[in-house]
């Protein structure tokens, strides 16, 4: 059968962008987006709006290989741009609105962004970030919000902005032929996992990977046609785990949400019949702890990832009516690629046993290829006994192409045919994966990744500081919070207090990165080679118990 080969008829590039075109045909009159009191669109309208924006981008010179950035919460425009930007041929770069101006500036410069869409309430952040750039700044486009008080921007007062989002829609061609990828390996999204000035980690994904991840997520979560999806997960977190494209594929309704508000979420669940939502474990905690947490009148599926929810939170949320699924993924995999596939026989187990099983991350999703845990020295698979730890490695279609402008980092992560996550875990005898420790330099607090190295770098700029190490401290509400262990220089007058160190950090980094605990030590513990033993400090932080500081 040597003559049987791929051809143009059987190998067109896979892309998730085509899901929107199909949704407009199949679900044209169905509701695609709901936001606030008055904003409602159908799938036909959403498709036309996206085509208009893509057309306008093309007309002002945006095209293949250009990076277009977006600084916005989960508004209708943010959802539309997940399609409209790639439709113009450009590469989509969502930026976390919780970052400070300095970090945003670093990311814009690193990716050489050609255009930046800015939510009206992030205008000051964007203008400050652009003012710090030493290279050509991106074209600025402001996105108004008629549903929010003060959300309609007066363009006359925004001299640094070239267009409004509505301008692009009005001037765009609804008959625009969107630009399909020449290859399914063409980049489609760029997401940053870290904003350090020395080495921003920009993760690049291709059309093929996002297509596979989108479909895989629908299958694994058993999402039916016409679901109602509530956007509690920020889209700037790894493109909302590819759900913008997946929900289009099944003709669902996107209930957009500017910011997390537990009472509002319960009202939206009731008013719109929400069936699905995602978020970090802190979302479960906030929903189950609020006074509004009355039993739901219908089940709501929640997918959470990262550190497992505490058993008490899990049981409380389930008693309200939430059906909880737990998984594991990274920015480098574009979404959840390991899920705790639930077995019916486990339903009859005691609550404590169910919580223990749900705390495990699970098995690979059906569309992913392989997951393993290997010995870091030999590279061989560890014994599947739930006790022998090793590094989690994986391979599958949704693994990133690599890190932007970082060939060394890419080569280190993608080697021997595997993606090396840096996370530590075990595999149980039944084949289920359980994480024992996230990547040693990453702290996950309220769903946000914090680079301990970046926090340490800031603390080292304080003249009185001799040594510093930042680790995760367990927190029942946030999951983890940064905990800084500090030794001060001998003979240094005016030694800083715990609060003074925290205040210094608040001026240098986003609020979520600031250490919530500072512990002074005469000397940090070290190995025989003189390296700080962070595992000792993690154990100390764990024994401190939970602590929450808002």
From Swiss-Prot:
Keywords: Fatty acid metabolism, Ligase, Lipid metabolism. It comes from the Eukaryota. Its EC number is 6.2.1.-. SUPFAM superfamilies: Acetyl-CoA synthetase-like. GO terms for biological process: fatty acid metabolic process. GO terms for molecular function: ligase activity. InterPro entries: AMP-bd_C, AMP-bd_C_sf, AMP-binding_CS, AMP-dep_synth/lig_dom, ANL_N_sf. Expressed at low levels in roots, leaves, stems and developing seeds. Signal peptide: none annotated. NCBIfam families: PRK08162.1. May act as an acid--thiol ligase that activates carboxylic acids by forming acyl-CoAs. Belongs to the ATP-dependent AMP-binding enzyme family. This is Probable acyl-activating enzyme 6.
């Amino acid at each position: 059968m040597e003559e049987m080969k791929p051809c143009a008829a059987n190998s067109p590039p896979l892309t998730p962008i085509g899901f929107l075109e199909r949704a407009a045909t199949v679900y044209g009159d169905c509701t695609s987006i709901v936001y606030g009191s008055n904003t409602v669109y159908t799938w036909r309208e959403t498709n036309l709006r996206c085509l208009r924006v893509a057309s306008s981008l093309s007309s002002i010179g945006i095209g293949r290989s250009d990076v277009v950035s977006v600084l916005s919460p989960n508004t209708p425009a943010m959802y539309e741009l997940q399609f409209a930007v790639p439709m113009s041929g450009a590469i989509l770069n969502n930026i976390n609105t919780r970052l400070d101006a300095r970090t945003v500036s670093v990311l814009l410069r690193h990716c050489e962004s050609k255009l930046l869409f800015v939510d009206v309430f992030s205008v000051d952040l964007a203008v400050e970030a652009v003012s710090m750039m030493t290279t050509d700044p991106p074209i600025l486009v402001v996105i108004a919000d008629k549903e929010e008080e003060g959300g309609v921007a007066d363009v006359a007062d925004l001299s640094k902005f070239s267009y409004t989002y509505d301008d692009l829609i009005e001037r765009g061609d609804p008959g625009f032929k969107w630009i399909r990828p020449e290859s399914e390996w063409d980049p489609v999204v760029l997401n940053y996992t870290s904003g350090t000035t020395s080495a921003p980690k920009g993760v690049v994904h291709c059309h093929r990977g996002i297509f596979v991840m989108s479909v895989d997520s629908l299958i694994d979560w058993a999402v039916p046609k016409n679901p109602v999806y509530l956007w509690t997960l920020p889209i700037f977190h790894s493109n909302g785990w590819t759900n913008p494209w997946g929900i289009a594929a099944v003709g669902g309704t996107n209930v957009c949400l500017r910011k997390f508000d537990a009472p509002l979420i319960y009202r939206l669940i009731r008013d719109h019949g929400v069936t699905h939502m995602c978020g970090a474990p802190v979302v479960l905690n906030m929903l189950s702890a609020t006074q509004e947490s009355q039993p739901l009148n219908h089940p709501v599926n929640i997918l959470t990832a990262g550190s497992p929810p505490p058993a008490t939170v899990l049981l409380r949320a389930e008693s309200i009516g939430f059906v909880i699924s737990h998984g594991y993924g990274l920015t480098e995999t574009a979404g959840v690629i390991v899920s705790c596939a639930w077995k019916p026989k486990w339903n009859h187990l005691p609550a404590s046993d169910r919580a223990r099983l749900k705390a495990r991350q699970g098995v690979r999703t059906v569309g992913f290829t392989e997951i393993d845990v290997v010995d870091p020295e030999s590279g061989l698979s560890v014994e599947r006994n739930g006790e022998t730890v090793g590094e989690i490695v994986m391979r599958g279609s949704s693994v990133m192409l690599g890190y932007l402008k970082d060939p060394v980092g890419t080569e280190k992560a993608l080697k021997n045919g595997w993606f090396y996550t840096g996370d530590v875990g075990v595999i149980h005898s039944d084949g289920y994966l359980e994480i024992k420790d996230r990547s040693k330099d990453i702290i996950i607090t309220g769903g946000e990744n914090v680079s301990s190295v970046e926090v340490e770098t800031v603390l080292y700029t304080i003249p009185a500081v001799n040594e510093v190490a930042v680790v995760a401290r367990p927190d029942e509400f946030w999951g983890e919070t940064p905990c800084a262990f500090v030794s001060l220089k001998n003979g240094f007058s005016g030694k800083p207090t715990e609060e003074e160190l925290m205040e210094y950090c608040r001026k240098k980094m986003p609020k979520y990165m600031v250490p919530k605990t500072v512990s002074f030590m005469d000397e940090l513990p070290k190995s025989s080679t003189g390296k700080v033993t962070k595992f000792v400090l993690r154990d100390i932080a764990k024994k401190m118990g939970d602590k929450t500081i808002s």
